Amino acid sequence: MSSKASRLCVAALLLPLAFTGAHAQLRGHGGPVRALAISPDGTRAVSGSFDTAAILWSLTRNVAEQVMRFHDAAVNAVVFLQDGRIATAGADAHIAIWTPGKQTPDAVLDGHTGPIVDLAVSPDGKTLASASWDHSVRLWPLDGGLPRVLEGNAQNVNGVAFSPDGKEVISAGYDATVRIWKLAGDGVSVHNLPSPLNSVVIAPDGEIVAAGASGKVFFLSPGGDLRGEVEAAPTPVIQLAISPDGSLVAAAGIRGSVAVIDRKTRKLVRTLIGPGLPVWSVAFFPDGKTLLTGGTDRVIRRWNAVSGEPIDSAVVGAPEDPLKQYAGDHGAEVFRHCVACHTLTPDEGNKAGPTLWHLFGRRIATLPGYNFSPALKQLDIVWSKQTVSKLFEIGPAHYTPGTKMPEQTIGSPEERQALVDFLGRVTTK
């Protein structure tokens, strides 16, 4: 199956969506829901996924209004613009600007050289900020023109936000820094934190909230001084959301929970635990009491952020666990993080990534029918237990430069060995 055909098949699966009840969950993506945004009036949401698609949803009618297909890799960030349009950004380093109802983007913003993982709109609605793994932030004038490039991070920039007055841009990086960029000039202040950072949000009073690899949520003054911290999860926090009034912060953990924190008291109010976790994306409704979460099981759920309960616990058309037959196999559980993008059998074909059937002994970027990037085709790697283990030891971005694979490492040698042993058993039958 060609890459184009694969995308068309994914698109076909997105269209016949099913919903029940006034608060039914939203299902339609073919991979984990990586990004969420809710319109200012609370009537619409847009989601982005590892399946390379973005979906515009009506939250009043619980229907998918539009499937937006443009990106060649995971859609990592989505945002509503003040004029009603939508911006999507992906691991393909492109930003697309959409008018709802149109099948192609109004504009494509190019300039980044690595995956784009976060977007933010200035308070006046005139500028779009993007954070990228090329170690930069770019500020795009939405009325046209060249972007301003903010550089200085030593590693991936994972989060970006504007100050409430629009005079500053705040970035969070995997180099464990929060950077505050003065837009009226070239001034920047750098504030070091104890852990690599994955996300940043700004409260209406200007307080900076950042979180990352340690599982802690850090609270900084508008000037960057550390005011406090809350342990949200025992594993990395991958995304933050803040309620419109700034009273609550939601922290999505990579392995199984969403912590709801009272920003004023620095107290953990609730921990959301239920189906669909771990959570990749989270967003508050305008009421500040309701959350949307996007999970690994491809379903978007609504939660009462105050009580911690799902608003509707029924999942419509939830997919069967593709690893059910391997229950109890530790290697299969390690592989679960990869199952959204890769299949194990020839019958299942390709997903967002190529099938792993007969992986070992195959030269990188040579599987027929899959559209690999030119950069991967230049690499001299033959997949084996040793090379796959190395991939997850140092990360795809370092081992396979030019990849569109989400950045993920496995720190434990035992877990890496369990993974490659599992792949050896199930992909060579």
Predicted features along the sequence, with ranges:
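Hydrophobic beta-strand positions that form the internal "hydrophobic ladder"
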Residues: A45, I86-A87, L128, V169, ...
